[in-house]
Amino acid sequence: MRTAVLSTLRPLAGLLLAAMLAGCGTQASQPSPTSSARPRSTATLSIVQPKNDAVVSATTMLVQFQLTGGEIVAQTSTHLTPNQGHIHLSIDGRLISMNYQLQQDVSLAQFAPGPHTLQGEFVAIDHAPFNPRVIARMIFDYEPSG
């Protein structure tokens, strides 16, 4: 009886294994609908101030961006428009502000002395990135005086 059951299950196990292996094919993954549905932007973003590798000694740093081909809008919406949005400013990967202007004073009081990465990203009016992303980044060295 046991031999009969095993001889019946072996072909089923083989079919199951073949089906599992077929599901693990080498097809290229498709982009997710979310990433392919993001609006495109032809805008470019650069950091005007501070300059790359600047040494900052004050506890407040003026950050100034230049945005070309895009428009800063002070609204949030799910009706996405290419090249309209605002700037997310981060230091060392930590979001500092969602900025609706091209310049702002940033407090450095909570940061340790040493090198830091400043990044600005021009994002759509729903706070999500464009596709491709519009990013500017630079390194500055924070050396507080006193």
Locations of regions flagged by a protein language model:
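Bacterial N-terminal signal peptides that target proteins for export
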Residues: 2-13
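C-terminal motif of bacterial Sec signal peptides marking the signal peptidase cleavage site
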Residues: 20-23
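Bacterial signal peptide processing site
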Residues: 25-27
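Short, compositionally biased P/S/T/A/G/V-rich stretches that sit at domain boundaries
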Residues: 29-58, 146
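Short amphipathic, basic-aromatic surface patches that mediate peripheral association
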Residues: 66-78
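Surface-exposed, short loops/turns at beta-strand junctions within beta-sandwich domains
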Residues: 109-115
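Short acidic/polar inter-strand loop motif in beta-rich domains
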Residues: 123-133
